């Protein structure tokens, strides 16, 4: 099956997820399904404060409503479209700082999703750290062709954020593919498990947003995860107004169960190998047919260079 628009919410759920759906607890507050969801997210992110939302853009709406506003700037490798929209809706501005390799679709490089570290430093100096509420790394870089970000780049961004005391968040929609690319392409990680690599990625972040419609295979859902209790309290207060109570966040208990299970299943190396090789297979076939595409193949989709392919439009 090829979906020409998105992989968001279109994945086939596993038999375990469907079984979990049948066990979903629909209690309004304190549902056991929430606590299973919470533990699953914590096991990957290591973050203590977990806030469910009905999908990723709802998590973005909450965090940027609180931290955004006129005169504020959010820096990223490349912001996804809903992320940018929520930033701009708050009155703030989003700035993309993609690395040079990511600007050339047809030239292969192992980590074309990286942030330009020099540009990050220069932009912080120019704008002022006090005007930057957050730096965001999107993994994999969706709007940049599903390209991965290296662990070295994540650490470098983290170090700069720490120097200027700017919160560092991860847009984690496709963290599992990114972890697997690090395992395949980055020195020192070939013998580590995907979970170990994911744990390390999140250890450098102050928080994350995620749409669970991608790497959790779910048809709906998302979450915020963070370490800052004061910020989490503000997010939960807004969640109650816009999404629902803090233990369901606009989701049914059955969806929380499906997400909890999916987050564990995505870490299966055999599945990730199948997924990424499938994308690679289609990418290579298109290259053989003379179709200009983003190279190398990304983790979740084949990106056609439409400007090159259809220059007359």
PLM regions with names:
Residues 3-13, 17, 26-50, 54-291, ...:
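Conserved PLP-enzyme active-site core in the AAT-like
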Residues 293-313:
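Conserved PLP-binding catalytic core of the aspartate aminotransferase-like
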